[in-house]
Amino acid sequence: MPRELPYVPKQLIVKVFTVENSTFLAQLIGPVFIVMGVGMLISPRNYRMTAEEFLRSRALIYIAGLMALVPGLAIVLTHNVWIFDWRLIITVLGWLGVIGGVFRLLFPQQVTAIGSMMLARPEWLRAPGAVVGALGLVLAYFGFVG
């Protein structure tokens, strides 16, 4: 006869799953964002050249749309946590991936226009680099330490 498991409230199961999920996603996204942020800050010229090449290619815009939409949707489906703590960062990043992916897939000409406008201002690479790096540090901290 199989042993019966003790009763565990559903809210506790969901919360444990979400915390484990959050930690994994923070460990995954945090270091990537740190590297991206540092790269944008120490070599903005390389990022600018990459962005200019990207904006000249509809195929790359399309692929980038898919590469933003798929993981963004995966995050939204598995981590749609609207609690005001560090986990909200992951949820917002998921939704930004979905929105950004859809925008790239449906409106590639607007992506080119907006991207070209942003590249015309050098500070538009340094400021996002600092933000991305800071988000990476926060996520890495909570993913590995906190």
Residue spans for each PLM region:
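Membrane-interface extramembranous regions
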Residues: L5, P9-G146
